[in-house]
């Protein structure tokens, strides 16, 4: 490993990890990505990106936003519609309408969806060969015996690697988070939010035949008591993505996994009193069905995203319930800031005092800057996502099923995400970094 540059190890080859790797490589910063899976793999489900996330993609590397647009499916309308999935009369969804509760303008081609695997595949094709090493499950991170090598990474297969900086993009069940905070720390693990999601992709021909064109061509949020669902087209309109959420008062039954495939009967029961549109959507989902426990960092948020030369990003730092549809985009914002701080640190390495010690101090300052800029907003997203999930299921004691009050809450919370000024975030990042470097130099 060269000691003339900052070499970075990224743990996790999901969307956040690969986005970050592409951004660092485009800035000339050497990167290795270590992924525990056998290959690039994302769940067979849809994902959406809000306008702020697309802006952040451009900041990281314009090729990333172009890759997303290649696989994104435009909505038939630029308005996101929230409908009453519960109080719908009639029996045939092709002849009935869910009551429109409210709608919010997304902007031109805003909040488009795609298939996760399609997007990750596009990103992977942008990576140079050899950047990602698969079947590498991280065990520990510790300072290397030779200070010039930075951090020593040990993997569960007995192999090792070194890097000056380590970034955990290893998702909700992050090993890097455990290492950074301590395995016994309450925030070392995410916690069950007492909702799970039944996820599935319905061939569009079947969905269109059963529901009618208007109900499958754009993005809908179907609200109701103790359950709700999001539907939108993906894969260039060939599939209807369905995410049906169910409140679950019980503990998640599987200690070793947060996903399970089981009979559809519990999901069917949760939506049994809903209107014909939602009942038909659930009927169209496969049986058995994939169920995903919604874990997040709401109960015990990390009190820092960094320590020394180690930091966490994306779901590893701020796992959020998906009710805002903004978790992955928040990870892209993280990547934009991390690219900036490491780029600024790398440009100072040649003039850093004390050689290796100066490099280590710059990395620490870079990661502390990232923590200072990102943690408040990211944790707000975690908290707001919980609020939104309760609003959609009429569980908020003050709002209940009041559509006007629900709209007001959803509107300001959504726009706080969508309208975030990424350029201002980048200016703040540079200012905080320079101020911290100056403070270190004085000491």
UniProtKB/Swiss-Prot annotation:
<dbReference type="GO" id="GO:0071949">
    <property type="term" value="F:FAD binding"/>
</dbReference>
<dbReference type="GO" id="GO:0004497">
    <property type="term" value="F:monooxygenase activity"/>
</dbReference>
<feature type="binding site">
    <location>
        <position position="35"/>
    </location>
    <ligand>
        <name>FAD</name>
    </ligand>
</feature>
<feature type="binding site">
    <location>
        <position position="328"/>
    </location>
    <ligand>
        <name>FAD</name>
    </ligand>
</feature>
<feature type="binding site">
    <location>
        <position position="315"/>
    </location>
    <ligand>
        <name>FAD</name>
    </ligand>
</feature>
<dbReference type="InterPro" id="IPR036188">
    <property type="entry name" value="FAD/NAD-bd_sf"/>
</dbReference>
<feature type="binding site">
    <location>
        <position position="116"/>
    </location>
    <ligand>
        <name>FAD</name>
    </ligand>
</feature>
<feature type="binding site">
    <location>
        <position position="48"/>
    </location>
    <ligand>
        <name>FAD</name>
    </ligand>
</feature>
<dbReference type="GO" id="GO:0016020">
    <property type="term" value="C:membrane"/>
</dbReference>
<dbReference type="InterPro" id="IPR002938">
    <property type="entry name" value="FAD-bd"/>
</dbReference>
<feature type="transmembrane region" description="Helical">
    <location>
        <begin position="5"/>
        <end position="25"/>
    </location>
</feature>
<feature type="glycosylation site" description="N-linked (GlcNAc...) asparagine">
    <location>
        <position position="75"/>
    </location>
</feature>
<comment type="pathway">
    <text>Secondary metabolite biosynthesis.</text>
</comment>
<feature type="glycosylation site" description="N-linked (GlcNAc...) asparagine">
    <location>
        <position position="87"/>
    </location>
</feature>
<keyword id="KW-0503">Monooxygenase</keyword>
<keyword id="KW-0812">Transmembrane</keyword>
<dbReference type="Pfam" id="PF01494">
    <property type="entry name" value="FAD_binding_3"/>
</dbReference>
<comment type="function">
    <text>FAD-dependent monooxygenase; part of the gene cluster that mediates the biosynthesis of nigerpyrone and its derivatives carbonarone A and pestalamide A. The biosynthesis pathway begins with the polyketide assembly by epaA to form phenylacetyl triketide precursor from successive condensation of two malonyl-CoA, presumably with one phenylacetyl-CoA starter unit produced by the phenylacetyl-CoA ligase epaB. For the nigerpyrone biosynthesis, the reactive polyketide chain is released as an aldehyde through the R-domain. A nonenzymatic cyclization and dehydration may create nigerpyrone.</text>
</comment>
<dbReference type="InterPro" id="IPR051104">
    <property type="entry name" value="FAD_monoxygenase"/>
</dbReference>
<keyword id="KW-1133">Transmembrane helix</keyword>
<dbReference type="GO" id="GO:0044550">
    <property type="term" value="P:secondary metabolite biosynthetic process"/>
</dbReference>
<keyword id="KW-0285">Flavoprotein</keyword>
<keyword id="KW-0325">Glycoprotein</keyword>
<keyword id="KW-0560">Oxidoreductase</keyword>
<protein>
    <recommendedName>
        <fullName>FAD-dependent monooxygenase orf3</fullName>
        <ecNumber>1.-.-.-</ecNumber>
    </recommendedName>
</protein>
<keyword id="KW-0274">FAD</keyword>
<comment type="similarity">
    <text>Belongs to the paxM FAD-dependent monooxygenase family.</text>
</comment>
<keyword id="KW-0472">Membrane</keyword>
<feature type="active site">
    <location>
        <position position="199"/>
    </location>
</feature>
């Amino acid at each position: 490993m060269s000691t003339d540059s900052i070499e970075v190890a990224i743990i996790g080859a999901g969307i956040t990890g690969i986005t970050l790797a592409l951004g660092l490589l485009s800035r000339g910063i050497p990167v290795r990505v270590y992924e525990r899976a056998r290959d690039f793999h994302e769940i067979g489900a849809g994902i959406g990106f809000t306008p702020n996330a697309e802006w952040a993609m451009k900041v990281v590397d314009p090729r990333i936003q172009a890759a997303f647009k290649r696989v994104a499916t435009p909505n038939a309308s630029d308005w996101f519609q929230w409908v009453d999935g519960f109080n719908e009369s009639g029996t045939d969804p092709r002849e009935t309408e869910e009551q429109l509760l409210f709608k919010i303008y997304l902007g031109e081609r805003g909040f488009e969806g795609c298939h996760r695997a399609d997007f990750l595949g596009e990103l992977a094709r942008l990576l140079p060969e050899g950047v990602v090493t698969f079947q590498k499950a991280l065990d520990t991170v510790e300072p290397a015996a030779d200070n010039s090598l930075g951090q020593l990474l040990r993997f569960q297969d007995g192999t090792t690697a070194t890097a000056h900086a380590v970034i955990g993009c290893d998702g909700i069940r992050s090993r890097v988070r455990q290492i950074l905070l301590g395995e016994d720390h309450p925030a070392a693990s995410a916690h069950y939010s007492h909702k799970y999601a039944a996820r599935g992709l319905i061939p569009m021909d079947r969905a269109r035949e059963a529901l009618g064109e208007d109900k499958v061509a754009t993005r809908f949020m179907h609200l109701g008591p103790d359950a709700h669902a999001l539907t939108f087209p993906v894969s260039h309109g060939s599939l209807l993505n369905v995410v049906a959420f169910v409140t679950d008062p019980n503990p998640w039954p599987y200690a070793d996994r947060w996903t399970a495939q089981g009979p559809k009967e519990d999901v069917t029961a949760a939506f049994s009193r809903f209107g014909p549109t939602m009942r038909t959507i659930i009927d169209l989902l496969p049986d058995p069905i994939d169920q995903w426990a919604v874990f997040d960092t709401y109960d015990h948020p990390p009190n820092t995203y960094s320590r020394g030369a180690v930091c966490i990003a994306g779901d590893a730092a701020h796992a959020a319930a998906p009710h805002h549809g903004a978790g992955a985009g928040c990870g892209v914002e993280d990547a934009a800031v991390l690219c900036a701080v490491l780029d600024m640190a790398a440009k100072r390495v040649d003039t850093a005092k004390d050689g290796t010690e100066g490099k280590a101090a710059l990395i620490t300052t870079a990661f502390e800057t990232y923590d200072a800029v990102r943690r408040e907003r990211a944790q707000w997203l975690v908290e707001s996502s919980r609020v939104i999930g309760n609003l959609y299921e009429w569980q908020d004691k003050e709002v209940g099923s009041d559509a006007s009050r629900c709209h007001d809450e959803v509107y300001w919370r959504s726009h706080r995400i969508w309208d975030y000024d990424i350029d201002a975030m980048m200016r703040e990042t540079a200012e905080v970094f320079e101020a911290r470097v100056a403070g270190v130099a004085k000491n």
